[in-house]
Amino acid sequence: MRLRFTIPAAALSLLGAAVAIPTVHANGPPPGHTGGFGEPTCLECHVGNDLNAFGGRVAVLGLPKTYERGRRYSLTVVLEAEETTSAGFQLSVRYGGGAQWGDPAGVLVPVDQRVSVTRAETGQLYANQTLQGSPSTDPDLATWALEWVAPSVGGPVAIHVAANSANGDDSPLSDLVYAADVTIPPARR
């Protein structure tokens, strides 16, 4: 009789574990998954492939070679990956050197309902997709628009972005994750 109750209890335990596994972050990942400054990427949850595998890429368009303090820049995060049915990203901009190393560098501003900006408990700003921004914009392509207001205090800034190309099975398995970073110095005064 005891065995009869043990099997259903074990099955319930497995069911509970399966429900606890995160399936998707369609409304944006938890803060701190850009791959920069010691952070993990989306690979922390989306497993099964290596980072930057299979010829896809993530890039941030609209970044200047040098930034002017206080200037507003229109940016586009672009994810190119085969078989993308839904996608997500996270981006941060921080000081990449000096006394402010790792501190937020400027302000991130969403320009539509496809992107939101979150301030983490650490004070760091993160831009990411919203639920409306999760569907891919074209076959094998996802894009998100935002603005960056450069900081008023000079110093090199580091932009880190990670993006996830989801395969549409509503699980964290076999999705493709890409990451990129760029450092931009301030313009000379």
Task: Label every PLM stretch briefly.
Residues M1-A11:
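Bacterial N-terminal signal peptides that target proteins for export
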